[in-house]
Amino acid sequence: MARKQVSRKRRVKKNVENGVAHIRSTFNNTIVTITDEFGNALSWSSAGALGFKGSKKSTPFAAQMASETASKTAMEHGLKSVEVTVKGPGPGRESAIRALQSAGLEVTAIRDVTPVPHNGCRPPKRRRV
């Protein structure tokens, strides 16, 4: 019985010079997605995907590592400069932006797009430890 040939789709290297780095920083994790200007993802990384578990995911160091790995794979596509959009109140906000700069990407703008409710849902009750 002959095996059917399966054609695998290869990843095409895009030539993108300008992009957008979306940093989603929550209290539990930090997710960094780098896209082109139209929103098509070039690379992404998160603290959990790098092997950090539990409360270590929410550290600034984990956010820095996630930002570095996402920027390195995006620079293989020819990325040179990024606009940064930051969403969320987490501890990894500033360290993720600094890691993008130290990786060799030029940060042209930093935009805070954290959603603010106009008195919407009731927030979770205070934690008592």
Curated annotation (Swiss-Prot):
Claim: Coiled coil is one of the keywords in the record: no
Gene Ontology molecular function terms on file: rRNA binding; structural constituent of ribosome
Record's keyword terms, sorted: Ribonucleoprotein, Ribosomal protein, RNA-binding, rRNA-binding
Gene3D superfamilies, A to Z: Ribosomal protein S11
GO annotations of cellular component type: ribonucleoprotein complex; ribosome
Known role: Located on the platform of the 30S subunit, it bridges several disparate RNA helices of the 16S rRNA. Forms part of the Shine-Dalgarno cleft in the 70S ribosome.
Protein name (record): Small ribosomal subunit protein uS11
Organism, scientific name: Staphylococcus carnosus (strain TM300)
GN (gene name): rpsK
